[in-house]
Amino acid sequence: MKIKDAVNMIRWEYREKIDDYVIIIIDRLTENGLKEISFSELDAVDNNYLYLKSEENTVIPLHRVLMIKRKSDNALIWKR
């Protein structure tokens, strides 16, 4: 399954529990090199980028996405 398909599946099929899902990305500015982004922060996804709801209009390239997890049981939904 492609990243875009996994993101869209969660956004539309599990929208009632969207806060339970996070996207883990590579972020060189953090101490451990990883950053969690809640699905509630996500505005859109296309074939190349994640677009976040923010005043800065943050755009994250999909090649930085490492995995998608469910927080409640720490289940791995998608992994590179």
Curated annotation (Swiss-Prot):
InterPro entries, A to Z: MJ1316 (IPR040459), UPF0248 (IPR007547)
Regions annotated as coiled coil: none
Look up the domain of life of the source. Answer: Archaea
Pfam families associated with the record? MJ1316 (PF04457)
HAMAP family membership: UPF0248 (MF_01245)
Q: Which family does it belong to?
A: Belongs to the UPF0248 family.
What is this protein identified as?
UPF0248 protein LS215_2790
Q: Top-down, what is the taxonomic lineage of the species of origin?
A: Archaea, Thermoproteota, Thermoprotei, Sulfolobales, Sulfolobaceae
